UniProtKB/Swiss-Prot annotation:
Pfam families: KduI (PF04962). It comes from Salmonella paratyphi B (strain ATCC BAA-1250 / SPB7). Zn(2+) binds at residues 196, 198, 203, 245. This is 4-deoxy-L-threo-5-hexosulose-uronate ketol-isomerase. Its EC number is 5.3.1.17.
Length: 278
């Protein structure tokens, strides 16, 4: 488990490129036949990836020992979105088939967590966010057909994008975890611009669906102290509550957003005008 400490905004603005990357960038999300796990002190979120190739991957009691409990979900909830080939997640003996861009919410108290791919040549890539939970909600699969997409932006401002809200109160109940997937239209480069912060939630982005010769300049920092981190395909970045979180790519891309904090009101954000950025 890779543990990332929280960091004050006054400290963050003094960091150079390598230090910023060390604090906020998560580079190796998917590793064949393993699960990865990155624990942030910011709202105690855990993010990572699971990519079964030659055999199934189980998250067992060994993780619980690192969290001071018996198993991962003794006091947590889990959200998973598959960005790879078809696969399945077995939760306490019940198999849930999870295709490309399908998602599964797993409530507090689940014990057995086994992840499998249907084909080794095209393995599933299960990206997950895991957050503290105070009560148990039912495990539920969410497919793209279950989500009402919202298209925002304009080709003229190069920010036309479609937002798919997978885990939000209108779709299912969770304790605090919200997740979704935003896809930029071809030829569009900007996400979340004009940008915002949200004092009551932190956020993690996973950038993917990127070509090898492309990158995203992820904008972060306080609105008057902006910095950037260069992102490659299938890398994630941690965004504290005090930080903007926006990006511009050399080509179109897709990203998964995950939020935890004290509320789940999607529009509870503090907008920042472009002319106020520094």
């Amino acid at each position: 488990m890779d543990v990332r400490q929280s960091i004050h905004s006054e400290h963050a603005k003094t960091l150079d490129t390598q230090a910023l990357r060390r604090e906020f960038l998560i580079e190796n999300i998917f590793v064949a036949d393993e699960y990865t796990m990155f624990y942030s002190h910011i709202d105690r979120i855990i993010v990572g990836g699971i990519m079964p190739v030659s055999h199934s991957v189980e998250i067992g009691g060994e993780v619980g020992k690192q969290l001071g409990v018996s198993r991962l979900l003794d006091r947590r909830e889990l959200g998973v979105i598959n960005i790879g080939g078809a696969g399945a997640i077995i939760v306490d003996g019940q198999r849930h088939d999870i295709g490309h861009r399908d998602a599964l919410y797993i409530g507090k108290g689940a014990k057995e967590l086994v992840f499998v791919s249907n084909e080794a040549s095209r393995p599933a890539k299960f990206y997950y966010n895991c957050a503290p939970a105070h009560t148990a909600y039912p495990t539920k699969k969410v497919s793209p057909a279950d989500v009402a997409p919202v298209t925002l932006g304009d080709n003229l401002t190069s920010n036309r994008r479609t937002i798919n809200k997978y885990f939000v109160p209108d779709v299912l109940e969770t304790c605090q975890l919200s997740m979704g997937l935003t896809e930029l239209a071809p030829g569009n480069l900007w996400n979340t611009m004009p940008c915002h912060t949200h004092e009551r939630r932190m956020e993690v982005y996973l950038y993917f669906n990127m070509e090898e010769d492309s990158c995203v300049f992820h904008m972060m920092g306080q609105p008057q102290e902006t910095r950037h981190i260069v992102m490659r395909n299938e890398q994630a970045v941690i965004s504290p509550s005090w930080s903007i979180h926006s990006g511009v790519g050399t080509k179109a891309y897709t990203f998964i957003w995950g939020m935890v904090g004290e509320n789940q009101v999607f529009d509870d954000m503090d907008h920042v005008a472009v002319q106020d950025l520094r």
